[in-house]
Amino acid sequence: MPSSFPEFPSQETIRSEFQAQNDGKEPPVGYHTTETLIRSIDIIVNKRGGFLSNDVMPPFVLMDNIPAWETGALRQARDLSLAMRNDITRSQSQSEEDPNLVQAQVLLNNDSEKWIFPSAEGKYNEAAQRLRDYRAQLVDTDSREGDFYARSDNLAAALELMSKRLGSMSQNLAASVAEERRYTALANDPTSSSAKARPPAEVMKTPWMQVDNVFYQARGTTWAMLSYLKAFEEDFDRVLADKNAHPSMDQIIRELETTQKALYSPMVLNGYEFGLVPNYSLAMSSYMTRANAGLIDIINLLRDG
């Protein structure tokens, strides 16, 4: 599949490199997810051309598509680090957080537009180092520090963060064409209330100059999601097999892979739904919505199945 974006961290490469360094042993549970997160951060920050989100000089300050991609991918890295800190590496709700993951999660939440005192790149590279420290403890069988619990509830917690991100991005993409949206936040609950009054319906439309930014942010989001879902298939293999959820996960991955196809137009086309010119944002939204529906099904299966 042709793509103009960085290659995904390869799970086969991660496994083979670990085996080459450890006399053919299989990686421990959690190694694929941790290593994929580390490599994705390295790609975001140190890819060809570097990290552009915080550049303040031309021509890079005028190149907003790559910074939008970086924003989407970085948000997913933050979400995964949060899931690892709060859920996946803790045996129960009263257990202690892993200090390396605490530091990594905090460092990843530094402002991506800071270019000095401190620079965003410096903080993100430091976060990757904290993850390497956690990884070293994970593979050390003599250490009691650094664990990874591949349970169905932990996987569900990580997938829920992805589902919310997909839902938000899908709505933003759909707004490339003006549409009336009903206010449904308080629907189906007669006792609910909100802090602010809202009109029953609003017309939502992304400004023309921001359509490509939203599109490339979605590309970055799905790029990172694909990397992490493939890692989950390795580390949560027994959980997914027990729920017979591998086919569903494979279908989600197929939907998201479609979002990474190369664009053959020099600009993000933004036609109407059934007009002569295609609408790339609506096409992207369709794939992400289907992937999100699959994620919701797996989450329900993990919670209730």
Q: Language-model features: where?
A:
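Long, amphipathic, charge-rich alpha-helical segments that form helical bundles/coiled-coils
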Residues: N100-L138, S248-E273
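Long, low-complexity intrinsically disordered regions
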Residues: M1-S4, A68
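A cross-kingdom feature marking solvent-exposed beta-strand/loop segments within repeated
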Residues: N54-N65, D111, P118, E202-D212, ...
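Extracytoplasmic/periplasmic, Sec-exported soluble proteins
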Residues: V29, L62-Q76, T89-E96, N100, ...
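Extended amphipathic alpha-helical interaction segments
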Residues: K123-I253
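Charged/polar positions within long, soluble alpha-helices
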Residues: N46, G50, D79-T89, E113, ...
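N-terminal Sec/ER secretory leader and immediately downstream segment
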Residues: S10-K123
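A cross-kingdom marker for long, charged
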Residues: S3, E7-E17, N213-Y216, T222-G305
